[in-house]
Amino acid sequence: MKLQANIQTEALLEASGIKKELFCQILSLARKYRVERLILFGSRARGDWRAASDIDLAVSGGDFPRFALDIEEAANTLLKFDMVNLNGPVQEELLDQIWKEGIVVYEKI
């Protein structure tokens, strides 16, 4: 199971253009702030990203304000993050986009 998860993670990183170090930082912060689910969406989930494309993340549960602030400050990247708090009001069109193309990259068990 762990090997399969590692293969899936490597495939996700390659398809999304997110470096492994940055991905590990994102997951570490998700655990720190007790995020329940983290969903990658947008161009990096679809695979049509460009080098300067932002990283779109939908966040469910946990301490969203601190997670969002820390990820901007602590993540070792010049890329921008676009974060959506799924526990707050979200436009229906955006929710549809997240459910349609989103990839769950972290889920608290």
Regions found by a protein language model. Give the residues of each.
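Catalytic core of pol beta-like nucleotidyltransferases
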Residues: 1-37, 45-51, 60-109
